[in-house]
Regions:
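Sequence/fold signature of self-assembling virion shell proteins
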Residues: 60-100, 107-112, 117-188
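Short, structured patches in soluble enzyme cores that scaffold and shape functional sites
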Residues: 10, 33, 115-117
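Residue-level detector of short, conserved catalytic/binding motifs and their immediate flanks
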Residues: 4, 27, 111
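Alpha-helical scaffold segments that mediate packing/assembly in large oligomeric complexes
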Residues: 13-24, 31-97
Length: 190
């Protein structure tokens, strides 16, 4: 992570403006650090479909060909689709069909829908309307009544694809974030 350094002029120090300027610069650096962390974290999802950024098995994060001992496994829809009732239901069905490397079913389920800001209103209708969204049917909204996505939808403002959406599951070893080396701050007195 690279954060441009800031400096305070000798005149500012001589005129006793150091405290006020240092406080402003410190806040700007803190914002910059927080922004950089968010951008880096979102880059995993922003590049999820790119084979230029493979994960441990050599495939894109979202792929129809994750190699395993039991054959290729997929974690994306067979046919790409926009966020709607049908595509979300199919993703939840696919998640319930996940198997491990030996072909045994694993008990995972979707817990949270991760979306860009452009999909927040569609997600609200799909997840939280009492009746099926976008139809004249009076059927109950099955995803809502069954509690299929208990943590609801969360908007990630750093996602760059306006129609990509992701489901976080309750798999025990999902995404992890850690600071390999913490930010180092130093003050040089002249």
């Amino acid at each position: 992570m690279c954060i441009r350094d800031s400096s305070i002029t000798e005149e500012a120090i001589e005129d006793n403006l150091y405290d006020r300027l240092a406080s402003r610069y410190t806040k700007a650096l803190a914002r910059s650090m927080a922004q950089t962390k968010q951008i880096k974290a979102a880059s995993i999802l922003n590049n999820a479909f790119s084979t230029s950024n493979p994960v441990g098995d050599g495939a894109a994060l979202c792929s129809s060909a994750h190699p395993s001992l039991s054959g290729n496994q997929r974690n994306l829809l067979t046919t790409a689709a926009d966020l709607n009732e049908t595509s979300l239901e199919q993703m939840l069905i696919d998640i319930a069909s996940f198997t491990d490397e030996r072909g045994l079913k694993v008990a995972v389920r979707g817990t949270k829908l991760i979306i860009p800001k452009e999909l927040q209103f569609i997600a609200e209708r799909v997840l939280n309307s009492n009746l099926r969204p976008g139809t004249a049917d009076n059927d109950a909204n099955a995803m809502k009544s069954m509690g299929m996505i208990p943590e609801g939808a969360v908007v990630n403002h750093f996602l760059t694809d306006t129609d990509a959406f992701f489901i976080k599951t309750d798999a025990p070893n999902g995404f992890k974030m850690f600071n390999r080396s913490p930010i180092k701050l130093s003050l040089i007195h002249i």
